[in-house]
């Protein structure tokens, strides 16, 4: 039983304080009430004098001035056409900040306000809305509604996909009722300055046949909507007056019985606000917290004050103060009240005969005696209604006075089950003005509904959908003022954010207004990586900015969904390396891996985190404080990484980068004072968008350091200026102009056109075009005495193949050195020693030595994990470990070849002499190698010709990495032995510092800087891929260094750069301005080939057959930049292959059929030796080609702070490519192979004219000059492609496979050209051998309808669980399981320290639970995943990271249309799994909004679509278990994708690629060559990503991203118009 602290029941309204705004206006507080007592309105109770201008409590407290003249009421304004355009408007900022209101044209006069406050029933005439239906059931809007509201309605229920059959208007109630053809009812209501539109949860029965207003009629009142059919059927739905308004807006009006009748109240930020009707502004009523504002069964308004007192805001009475928190309440029409309180997650019901009566505790139980854990309560005149923690509804007769318990009976909800599903949940109760009770319910998708309780008051029936609604609400006085300029960060493409009153605010570009986010912070800073970071309670967290839409429920309950992206910030996981106990008070961030923090002692430390992990890269570096005086208030870094510190006395100091980053300079480092324009009075410190130092003394001036001078600006406090187009947008637009193509009407096929003139390609656009002289110099000849480029390229290639790359010599030499060290180490006799893990565990260095011991453990763990990874990699290749990870003790014995050395016994001897741990994976594997006589063969590098490295060894570098790790473990053994000498002696700081220094030198220097470690950490395992990617990097370094390089020439054209320097600058700004899912790529391609044909003579065919064949090779280099989650993703790619081709062609002279004369008859003699021979020739050809290509790529991530330096290094050409790559992080190396087969056909019709250059009848060789004009057609008849690749990173491996079956007619093209050719032909007895070359001018139009499928499987090294993982899991479980037992257990788990123990407790409790909701399903799945991860991590294994099946189409119609073979298959085999088109069609059939989105995506031209499928949860869980138990490998996972029943639709993505490519194709005389360079960009047009719950077939919801997610111009204009009127669209 709870203790009740009694207070006097009387409560003056001046004590009634504002209440907390519920998380949503739907979470009503199920309150109680007492008898009604006279109470004055909150405004009349002395909150301010009505005769004086009211002061706005929100914002900075500025006053609102009364106006001498005012416009009409909002209702009248809305009824007058064009009023919003003609009325003068005050600046919005004055309203947001609570400043003076210059004009208030939309609110009533003071006299009208007085009438309203005093409860007069006089009302303004209803607005004329003029909503009608046309003959197709589409809404037609007149001018009666506000323009902005009309726009929003047109964008939602006004769409074509929403046909209506009946409409009724109630002008007195400002209400429109609608019925659609499915029987769903809609209502649009206006009430003063509020507008809502919503629809019924269920559907009414509709008559058969064609529906219209002739056979369906509607009638509506504020209380009810009735639908009648000509057949006599009728259905009615309660509207319950203002109840839906109150639930949707949170605005409640005092009843007429209250002295403040008509006064409007609402909650905002935990406070109670009242509407000042004279000015139409919400004003805070009191500083006391209130929550759960709601109307109760007696029609009066109640709220909970300070969480412990129930207050009747209408009568002024209050309950006793409860010692426990009030979680729900209720009051009935008889004045009886019920209160639910909660302590330790257990609730207690209290009943009171009147609000101020002594509470009577009542126990709740079922008939079988089981307790009921109540979450919501409601009292009617006769019954007690309870909703429990599972959302189940119960009822019991109202307990009589003194009854200690109530026996509950489950309520019957068949009608609600039929509409919302059996798994719906009752979450609360609501009441209308007449005290009628309705239940609040949530369906499976989380949408909220109001449900009338039926005639018996106990069985809920379907009512109205509150989630799928449109709500326009007056927020004047509640909206956020713009933060001060000194507290604002401009994040460029991510908009603006600011810090105000301890909360991060963001600028909503859709409404042109500042809004508060849920993120709290004491500091908001911009890192040098241009990312935002917050400091709160000693934790530094990166901010992520949302660029997706809100979540939309799947189904047809998204009528009022308006796609829009609000750039809302959210805080990520706290950066590692600091604890809350450190009391960090200030920060300066380079990036998420490097930052400086000031702790509670005032000391500064530089923290470094290993990229991609939560491990520290080095111990925190204490920074010097010499010369720095006073207590540090704030710190920052400028663009040169100069560190600035501001003390609390307003003095500013600086320390150069070299002095604070280099520990060797710390002793001599000295902070220097900075002279400022406000000397000694600096109040705030920061940087501008270019990271220049910025200071302020007050809110009026900002001083920015520019060089040695200061620039002073006076912020105007105005809304941000419209953002200028991003450079990336500008370049994309330019490339779009250069890309010629369009979509064929009524199809999804795009045709693209390309032009070439005399071998020069890229003539498609004359607007984006390089000079011919520049292109000739770049591709063909440099007009200097240098060796021609093609010859030099070939010579370099031969040299590199034989001797490797000079820049990689440090890697070659280090391999040799490490092998020599290994031999030297193992040649020394070693005695039996304790393993390293045990040695470290036994160390006792006291509290001061804990950091040293922890770093020893971390380094040992790194080395053991690294050696295990290398050994497993080698083991898989050698057959000692199978695909599933199981060890094969038999191995694959083999003999060594010339110069090879077996590393296995040498490595094993070294490991046994310096054992790592008793469970060392590497040592176990090496013993298996030795025992099974399976060698680890490696050829030592030498200086001999062609032997600098072994390019045939697929794991040469991985083997050397194992050697390095083994040697490092031996060195760590020795260091640990020396540290062990200090164990138990309580060593001093000097001795510990010496050991720490030595450990750091080993870890970061000898080991960390080793070139073999760096290369293998990037993912390189062999020299072949290393040299390929090195070649790619080197190629682009040359490309951007040389102004006349082909890549530079085309890049300057695309960037419209005047010089190379200008191009590099524009390249930086373009890359930095890339938005999410945008990329830019620079391409260089060259190739050559040889071909021959033979004209066969003497055949019976009507035409001479021409067989032919050829071989060609091509190499392609690509450098791409794309926007990633943590910066800019960079990819260097090189691909190339050989293509073999055979052909068969023929032609026939059709002159006689077209002209009536043969070619011979039309021949004209020029002279005795030469003649002119015209003809019309029809020809055809069939060719088959087979291509084998290699792919290599290097991917890594750069922060925005690193990118400019990286591009400078790329273009300078003065640094080694390895140093350039060292700037990046999270590298991965990709190597793959592609095999493709194509069967093509072509046909041509040409008008030709030839002149024999040799004498007539010359034999056996003749020469001809021929000109022709003609048309061509070609098609790709058959094609098949198979490819596979592996991308290897330090912590992850990704396998990609693509095995595309034979596909028919993927491509077709038509062209026209004019050609001049010359050559010779040699005649033999069997036929003729032609040798011709040609030059042409032509245009080609190609249609592409290719389909490509691939499967991607990602494995990630399992990391041991950390506190953040358990925190995330408990948060998920806490929100999903709200029964007291689970809640109490989770509370206990949060207090535990060890993740292993926490996981064990959670497993014990949740192992046997079955998910009842989607949230519980997700929670249990997360728990299972962490279990697998923790188990695998303890064995140094990998877990499944990502797995998906993607299908890409260039024909967008295939998104919803099956191909021919699928259609035939569906007819022949009924058991076939659904195709992608089948899946999508099924979804859009149930979801009109999604259908509209897909249709809009398909309307794009020159676009491609990618459909991704993923494994269902149960299948994925099976695979994860199989990987854990080593029963499933890569091939088993890929095999599951062959059964479509294992898959679900993950996403639909449509993107657009634009490109400018320029180059030359040289005329061919047996041998031909080509050279091209290009710039391309890719942009996401739209992505629909799906989320699933327990139902793995039908999505629960979806989100939008890309262009499709952004609000259209009509919507943003409407939102801005509303904002100007002080109105907002909720949601």
UniProtKB/Swiss-Prot annotation:
Its signal peptide is: none
What's the stated role of this polypeptide?
A: Major virulence factor that may function as a water- and solute-permeable channel dedicated to creating osmotic/water potential perturbation and a water- and nutrient-rich apoplast in which bacteria multiply within the infected plant tissues. Required for plant cell death in N.benthamiana leaves and leaf cell death in S.tuberosum. Essential for pathogenicity. Does not suppress callose formation.
Species of the source: Pectobacterium carotovorum
Bias class Polar residues marks the residues at: 22-44, 59-74
Motif WxxxE 2: residue span? 514-520
List where the motif WxxxE 1 lies.
464-468
Q: Which UniProt keywords apply?
A: Secreted, Virulence
- Note on domains (UniProt): Wx(3-6)D/E motifs are required for pathogenicity.
Which segments carry the region annotation Disordered?
22-102, 436-464
What superkingdom does the record give? Bacteria
Q: Where is this motif: WxxxE 3?
A: 660-667
Q: What is the lineage of its organism?
A: Bacteria, Pseudomonadati, Pseudomonadota, Gammaproteobacteria, Enterobacterales
Q: What is the effect of changing residue 464 to A?
A: Retains cell-killing activity. Fails to induce necrosis
Descriptive protein name: Type III effector DspE
Instruction: Tell what triggers its expression.
Output: Transcription is positively regulated by the alternative sigma factor HrpL.
GO cellular component terms listed in the entry, alphabetical order = extracellular region; host cell
Where does it mainly reside? secreted
Gene for this protein?
dspE
Q: What happens when the gene is disrupted?
A: Mutant does not elicit plant cell death in either potato or N.benthamiana.
Q: Where in the cell is it found?
A: Secreted; Host cell
Family membership: Belongs to the AvrE family.
């Amino acid at each position: 039983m709870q203790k009740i602290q009694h207070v006097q029941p009387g409560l003056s309204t001046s004590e009634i304080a504002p209440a907390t705004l519920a998380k949503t206006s739907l979470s009503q507080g199920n309150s109680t009430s007492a008898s009604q007592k006279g109470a004055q309105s909150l405004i009349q109770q002395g909150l301010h004098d009505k005769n004086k201008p009211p002061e706005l409590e929100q914002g900075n407290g500025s006053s609102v001035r009364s106006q001498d003249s005012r416009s009409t009421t909002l209702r009248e304004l809305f009824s007058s056409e064009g009023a919003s355009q003609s009325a003068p408007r005050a600046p919005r900022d004055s309203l947001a900040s609570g400043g003076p209101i210059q004009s208030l044209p939309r609110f009533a006069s003071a006299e009208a306000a007085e009438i309203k406050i005093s409860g007069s029933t006089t009302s303004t005439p209803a607005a004329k809305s003029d909503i009608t239906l046309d003959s197709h059931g589409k809404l037609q809007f007149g001018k009666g509604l506000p323009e902005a509201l009309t726009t929003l309605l047109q964008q939602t229920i006004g769409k074509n996909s929403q046909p209506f059959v009946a409409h009724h208007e109630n002008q007195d109630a400002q209400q429109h009722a609608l019925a659609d053809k499915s029987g769903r009812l809609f209502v649009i209501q206006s009430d003063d300055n509020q507008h809502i539109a919503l629809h019924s949860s269920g559907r009414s029965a509709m008559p058969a046949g064609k529906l219209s207003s002739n056979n369906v009629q509607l009638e509506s009142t504020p209380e009810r909507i009735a639908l009648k059919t000509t057949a006599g059927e009728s259905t009615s739905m309660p509207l319950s007056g203002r109840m839906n308004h109150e639930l949707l807006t949170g605005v409640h009006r005092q009843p007429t019985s209250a002295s403040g009748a008509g006064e409007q109240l609402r909650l905002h930020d935990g406070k109670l606000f009242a509407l000042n009707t004279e000015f139409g502004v919400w004003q805070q009523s009191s500083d006391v917290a209130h929550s759960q504002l709601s109307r109760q069964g007696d029609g009066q308004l109640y709220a909970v004050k300070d969480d412990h007192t129930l207050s009747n805001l209408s009568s002024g009475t209050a309950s006793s103060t409860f010692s426990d928190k009030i979680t729900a309440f209720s009051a009935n029409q008889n004045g009886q009240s019920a209160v639910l309180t909660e302590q330790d997650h257990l609730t207690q019901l209290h009943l009171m005969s009147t609000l101020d009566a002594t509470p009577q505790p009542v126990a709740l139980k079922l008939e079988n005696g089981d307790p009921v854990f109540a979450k919501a309560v409601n009292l009617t005149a006769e019954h007690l209604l309870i909703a429990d923690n599972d959302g189940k509804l119960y009822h019991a007769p109202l307990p009589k006075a003194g009854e200690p318990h109530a026996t509950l009976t489950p309520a019957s909800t068949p009608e609600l089950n039929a509409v919302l599903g059996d798994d719906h949940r009752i979450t609360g109760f609501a009441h209308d003005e007449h005290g009628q009770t309705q239940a609040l319910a949530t369906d499976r998708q989380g949408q909220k509904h109001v449900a009338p309780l039926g005639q018996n008051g106990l069985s809920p029936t379907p009512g109205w959908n509150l989630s799928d609604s449109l709500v326009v609400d007056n927020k004047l006085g509640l909206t956020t003022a713009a933060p001060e300029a000194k507290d604002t960060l401009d994040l460029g493409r991510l908009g603006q954010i600011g810090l105000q009153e301890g909360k991060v605010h963001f600028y909503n570009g859709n409404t042109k207004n500042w809004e508060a986010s849920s993120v709290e912070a004491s500091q908001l800073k911009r890192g040098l990586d241009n990312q935002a970071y917050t400091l709160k309670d000693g934790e530094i967290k990166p901010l992520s900015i949302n660029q997706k839409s809100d979540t939309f429920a799947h189904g047809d309950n998204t009528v009022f969904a308006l796609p829009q992206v609000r750039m809302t910030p959210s805080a990520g996981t706290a950066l590692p390396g600091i604890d809350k106990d450190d009391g960090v008070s200030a920060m300066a961030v380079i990036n998420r891996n490097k930052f400086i923090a000031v702790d509670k002692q005032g000391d500064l430390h530089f923290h470094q985190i290993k990229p991609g992990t939560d491990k520290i890269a080095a111990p925190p570096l204490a920074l010097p404080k010499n010369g720095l005086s006073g207590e540090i208030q704030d710190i920052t870094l400028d663009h040169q990484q100069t560190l600035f510190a501001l003390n609390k006395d307003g003095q500013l100091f600086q320390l150069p980068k070299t002095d604070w980053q280099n520990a060797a300079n710390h002793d001599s480092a000295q902070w220097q004072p900075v002279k400022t324009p406000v000397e000694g009075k600096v109040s705030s410190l920061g940087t501008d968008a270019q990271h220049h130092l910025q200071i302020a003394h007050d809110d009026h001036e900002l001083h920015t350091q520019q060089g040695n001078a200061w620039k002073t600006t006076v912020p105007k406090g105005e809304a941000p200026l419209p953002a200028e187009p991003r450079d990336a947008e500008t370049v994309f637009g330019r490339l779009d102009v250069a890309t010629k193509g369009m979509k064929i009407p009524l199809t999804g096929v795009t045709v693209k056109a390309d032009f070439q003139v005399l071998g020069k390609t890229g003539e498609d656009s004359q607007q984006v075009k390089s000079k011919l002289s520049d292109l000739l110099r770049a591709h063909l000849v440099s007009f200097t005495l240098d060796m021609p480029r093609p010859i030099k390229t070939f010579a370099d290639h031969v040299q590199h193949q034989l001797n490797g790359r000079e820049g990689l010599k440090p890697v070659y030499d280090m391999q040799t050195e490490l092998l020599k060290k290994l031999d030297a180490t193992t040649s020394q006799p070693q005695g039996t020693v304790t393993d390293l893990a045990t040695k470290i565990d036994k160390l006792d260095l006291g509290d001061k030595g804990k950091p040293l011991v922890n770093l020893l453990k971390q380094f040992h763990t790194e080395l053991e994990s690294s050696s295990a990874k290398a050994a497993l990699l080698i083991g898989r290749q050698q057959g000692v470990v199978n695909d599933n990870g199981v060890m094969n003790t038999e191995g694959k014995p083999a003999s060594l070849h010339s110069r090879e050395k077996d590393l296995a016994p040498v490595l094993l001897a070294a490991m046994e002499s310096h054992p790592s741990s008793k469970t060392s994976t590497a040592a176990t594997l090496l013993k298996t190698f030795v025992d099974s006589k399976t060698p680890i063969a490696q050829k030592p590098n030498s200086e001999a010709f062609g032997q600098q490295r072994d390019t045939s060894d697929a794991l040469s570098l991985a083997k050397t990495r194992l050697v390095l790790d083994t040697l490092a473990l031996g060195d760590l053994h020795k260091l640990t032995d020396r540290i062990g000498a200090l164990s138990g002696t309580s060593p001093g700081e000097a001795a510990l510092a010496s050991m720490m220094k030595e450990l750091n030198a080993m870890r970061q220097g000898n080991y960390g800087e080793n070139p073999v470690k760096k290369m293998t950490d990037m993912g390189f395992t062999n020299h072949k891929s290393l040299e390929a990617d090195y070649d790619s990097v080197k190629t682009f370094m040359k490309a951007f260094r040389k102004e006349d390089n082909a890549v530079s020439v085309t890049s300057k054209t695309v960037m419209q750069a005047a010089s190379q320097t200008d191009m590099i600058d524009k390249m930086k700004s373009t890359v930095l301005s890339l938005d999410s899912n945008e990329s830019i790529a620079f391409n260089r391609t060259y190739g050559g080939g040889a071909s021959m044909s033979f004209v066969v003579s003497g055949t019976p065919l009507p035409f001479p057959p021409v067989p032919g064949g050829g071989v060609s090779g091509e190499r392609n280099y690509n450098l791409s930049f794309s926007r990633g989650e943590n910066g800019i993703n960079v990819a260097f790619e090189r691909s190339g292959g050989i293509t073999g081709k055979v052909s068969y062609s023929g032609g026939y002279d059709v002159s006689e059929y077209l002209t009536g004369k043969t070619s011979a008859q039309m021949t004209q003699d020029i002279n005795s030796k030469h003649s002119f021979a015209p003809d019309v020739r029809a020809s055809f050809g069939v060719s088959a080609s087979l291509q084998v290509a290699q792919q290599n790529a290097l991917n890594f991530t750069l922060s925005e702070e690193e990118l400019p330096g990286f591009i400078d290094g790329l273009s300078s050409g003065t640094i080694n490519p390895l140093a350039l790559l060292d700037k990046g992080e999270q590298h991965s190396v990709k190597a793959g192979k592609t095999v493709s087969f194509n069967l093509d056909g072509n046909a041509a019709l040409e008008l030709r004219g030839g002149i024999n250059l040799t004498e007539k009848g010359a034999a056996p060789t003749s020469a001809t000059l021929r000109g022709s004009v003609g048309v061509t057609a070609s098609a790709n008849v058959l094609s098949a492609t198979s490819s596979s690749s592996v991308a290897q990173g330090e912590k992850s491996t990704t396998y990609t496979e693509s095995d595309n079956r034979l596909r028919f007619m993927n491509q077709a093209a038509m062209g026209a050209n004019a050609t001049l050719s010359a050559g010779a032909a040699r005649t033999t007895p069997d036929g003729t051998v032609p040798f011709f070359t040609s030059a042409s001018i032509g245009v080609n139009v190609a249609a592409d309808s290719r389909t490509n499928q691939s499967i991607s499987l990602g494995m990630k090294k399992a990391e041991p669980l950390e506190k953040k993982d358990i925190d995330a899991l408990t948060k998920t479980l806490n929100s999903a399981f709200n029964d007291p037992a689970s809640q109490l257990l989770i509370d206990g788990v949060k207090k535990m320290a060890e993740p292993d123990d926490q996981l064990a407790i959670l497993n014990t409790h949740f192992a046997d639970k079955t998910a009842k909701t989607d949230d519980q399903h997700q929670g249990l799945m997360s728990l299972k995943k962490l279990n697998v991860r923790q188990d695998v991590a303890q064995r140094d294994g990998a877990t499944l990271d990502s797995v998906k099946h993607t299908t890409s189409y260039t024909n967008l119609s295939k998104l919803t249309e099956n191909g021919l073979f699928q259609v035939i298959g569906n007819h022949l085999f009924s058991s076939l799994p659904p195709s992608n088109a089948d899946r999508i069609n099924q979804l859009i059939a149930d979801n009109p909004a999604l259908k509209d989105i897909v249709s809009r995506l398909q309307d794009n031209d020159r676009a491609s679509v990618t459909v991704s499928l993923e494994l269902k949860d149960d299948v994925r869980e099976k695979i994860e278990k199989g990987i854990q138990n080593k029963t499933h490998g890569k091939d088993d996972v890929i095999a599951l994708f062959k059964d479509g029943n294992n898959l679900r639709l993950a996403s639909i993505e449509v993107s657009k690629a634009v490109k400018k490519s320029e180059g030359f194709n040289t005329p061919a005389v047996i041998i031909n060559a080509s050279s091209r360079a290009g710039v391309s960009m890719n942009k996401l047009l739209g992505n629909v990503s799906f989320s699933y719950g327990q139902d793995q077939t039908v999505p629960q919801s979806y989100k939008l991203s890309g262009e499709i997610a952004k609000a259209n111009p009509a919507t943003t204009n409407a939102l801005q118009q509303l904002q100007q009127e002080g109105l907002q669209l909720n949601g």
